[in-house]
Amino acid sequence: MRHVQAELSPSSEPEAGPSQPPVTQGTLQGGLLMGYSPAGGATSPGVYQVSIFSPSAGVSEPPRALKRPAPSTEGPRELKRGPGLGAREGLPPEEPSTVGLVSPEGLGLGLGVASQHFSHHGLRVVEQGGSATSSWTSGTQSTPWPSSNASCNTLHTRDWAFPDQGGQGCLGESPGPAPSGQLHTLDTDLHNLAQIGGKSPVARVGNGSNPWPRESHGTANGHSPEHTPPGPGPPGPCPTKRRLLPAGEALDVSSEDEGPAPRRRRGTLGCPLAANSSDAKATPFWSHLLPGPKEPVLDPTDRSPMGRRLKGARRLKLSSLRTLRKGPGLLSPPSASPFPTPAVSRTLLGNFEESLLRGRFAPSGHIEGFTAEIGASGSYCPQHVTLPVTVTFFDVSEQNAPAPFLGVVDLNPLGRKGYSVPKVGTIQVTLFNPNQTVVKMFLVTFDFSDMPAAHMTFLRHRLFLVPVGEEGNVSPTHRLLCYLLHLRFRSSRSGRLSLHGDIRLLFSRRSLELDTGLPYELQAVTEAPHNPRYSPLP
C-alpha cells in the first residue's frame, strides 16, 4: 500500500537540502507530502492513501518548508525518471524517493484535529471523511494544467474554511492565497504507480513555472502523431481499463477494482475458435459468425462404407420410430421395469404353431434322409411322386416336452405348374424316415369345385390327442397337437387345380405316451380360409 500524506508541521527548523531551494515565509499557505513506501515492492497492489491534517481554528504558525527523508526499511535506491524530469526539477539521482512540502500551520496530530482521507483505488478517488473546520490551501500559483491531463491525474479537494481570494492555486509557486474548491493535480507518475505496480518514480515538484510542460500535438516521445495514442478526454470520471475476454468467459461488471480475471467454467460452450486465426483477441468478435456444425447430408449415390453405415443407421432409426407409432401397446410401461424394454419384433407375433410353420425359430439342426410320397384320387388319379423332405428340429422346450420336427417338401422339381390334382377328391401324403419306415400317413379330403380361375387358397389338416368322449366340446387347452399338414392350392387361367410351392409338415420325434391313465384318441381337424376363401393370384 502506498501512503501519500499531507500534514501541517509545527514550528521547527527546516531541513535544508542541497537540491531544495529556499522557501520564504508566507509564500506557501499549505503543503502536500507525496511519497510511497517501497516495502511493498513492485508486486503490491496499487492502493494509495492521502491524508490531510489541519489544526484547530486558532493555531497560527509561520509557513515553513520541510523535507522528509525516505523510510528506513530499505537502503536508498535510484529512481527511474522519465526523460527530462531530472534536469527540469533539479534533483540529483541520490535523493530519496519521498519528497514533499509541509505547511507549518501546526502539527495536526494533537487534540481537536480534523482530517480528510482520500483512497486512490485503481483510478477512483473516494473521500472518506471531512470536517467543516478544516482548512488547507496549496502553495504557489501557476498556469492551469493542460486539459488533456486533467481527467485521470487530479484529486479534487474542497477548502471549507477560506473563501476564494483570487487566482488559481496549483502545486507549484505562487505568492497568492488559494481559491475555494481548488484543483490539486498530482504527478502523472503517481497514477502510473497504481497501474504498473510501482515502477514509475515520484518526482519532486520544484520551483519554476509549470513543471509539466504542455505536450505538442505533433509528436509524443519522438513518435509520429499517427502512432501516438490519443490522450485522455475532458475532465470527468476516469475510464476503467478492461481487457478482452473470450466469448465463454463472463465479465464481472459489478466491480471496478482491478483483480484476477474470472475463470472459465468447465463445460461452457462458447463460440468455436478458428484454427487459422493469428489474432487471439479478435477471435471472439467474429467467430460467432461462423456456421455451426450441421448434420451430414446423405448422398444417395454415396457407395463408401461410411455412407452405407450412415444410411443403415438412419433406416434403423426410422424403422424404430415407425414400430413405436404402430404398436404402442406392445411396449411395457416405463415404470414396470427399471431397465428399458425393447419393442417386441413383429416377426414373433402369433402362436407357436404359426411360428414353426413360417420358420421364425432358429433351427438347432437338420436331419437328412426323410422322404414323402404324394398321391391324389378323384375324377382322375395322377401319378404318385416321391420327393425328399428337409427336416429341421428346434430346441424350444422349457418343460422337457418333445419339440416337433418341421418337414418341408419342395414342389419346384415338378415344374412350374406343380402337382396336378382334381377339384374334388382326396390327397394322400406318406412320410418316411431315413430307415424307410412310415412315420405318418395323412389323408385329406377337399372340394374346390367353386374355385375360380387364377386364384389360390390353402388347407391345414391337424391331428390332436383328446380325451375319449369329449370330441365335440373339448377346449383347446385340453388337446395336444400331434401332427400337422399344410397344403397350398392354385388354379390356372384354364381352371386346372394343382398343388404349388411346398408342403409343410409338423410331427413328433417319438410317440406320445400319456401317463394320466385317461384314454385318449386322435381327432382330425381340417381348416380352410374363409372371407375370402379364395384369393386372386398376384
Swiss-Prot record:
Q: Positions of the region Transactivation domain 1 (TAD1)?
A: 436-444
For region Required for macropage invasion, the annotated ranges are: 348-430
Feature: compositional bias, Low complexity: 130-148
What function does this protein fulfil? Transcription regulator that may syncronize transcriptional and translational programs.
Q: What is this protein called?
A: Atos homolog protein B
Q: Which domain of life is it from?
A: Eukaryota
Q: Where is this region: Disordered?
A: 1-103, 130-149, 163-185, 199-272
Locate the Phosphoserine modifications and list their residues.
S254, S255
Comment text on domains:
The protein contains a transactivation domain (TAD) which may be required for transcriptional activation of a subset of target genes.
Q: Which family does it belong to?
A: Belongs to the ATOS family.
Say which species the protein is native to. Rattus norvegicus (Rat)
PANTHER family, A to Z = ATOS HOMOLOG PROTEIN B, GH03947P
The gene that this protein is the product of is Atosb
Q: Where in the cell is it found?
A: Nucleus
List keywords of the entry alphabetically: Nucleus, Phosphoprotein
Q: Where is the composition biased (Pro residues)?
A: 227-238
Q: Which GO terms describe its cellular component?
A: nucleus
